[in-house]
Amino acid sequence: MTSQMESDVVVVGAGPGGSATAAHLARRGLHVTLLEKVTFPRDKVCGDGLTPRAVKQLIRLGIDVSEEAGWKHTEGLRIHGGRIAPFVLPWPELADYPNFGMVCRRTVLDERLARHAESQGVALVEGVNVTDPILDPSGRIRGVRTSDGTEYSAPVVVAADGNSSRLGLAM
């Protein structure tokens, strides 16, 4: 039997982009459902570094980026390679951005952002595999279907399921 869930927005993928999108929309009063194919914590191959521009976006989301909150601040980009001794390129001093970057493992970063989205009112559903978009008779996307047959309906669907986005390709 197929069950159906309705939202204002369905976001597929709870990586940094999907979780941030969901949190911003929920803060503006929309009912958002965030679907993630695995359960947290989960790992992802990544350099784990955040530039000052990325840090600014975390601040805009309302994330505590202090070292006391467990973040490792960096003063610049450390370069290692070839026959040159390692050196640091300091982050540029720009008035609109913090003067530091950060390092955070993706196992920690992704879960922090997803839990933050939940704290903003987002309905986070983990361990669901989105298989395809649901189309209305005119061909407009009106939701998504998961491998267990559950349908998540919304007038807006965001494909934030990564570089090899199956949903994005199907859209």
List where the protein language model places each region.
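Beta1/beta-strand and adjacent pyrophosphate-binding region of the FAD-binding site
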Residues: 2-15
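Conserved N-terminal glycine-rich FAD pyrophosphate-binding loop of Rossmann-like flavoproteins
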Residues: 39-61
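Glycine-rich FAD pyrophosphate-binding loop
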Residues: 26-46
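A conserved beta-strand/loop capping segment in the N-terminal third of enzymes
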Residues: 55, 60-111
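N-terminal Rossmann-fold NAD(P) dinucleotide-binding loop
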Residues: 18-19
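Predominantly flavin-linked oxidoreductase catalytic cores and closely associated redox partners
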Residues: 116-171
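Short phosphate-binding/catalytic loops that engage adenosine nucleotides
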Residues: 30, 63, 122
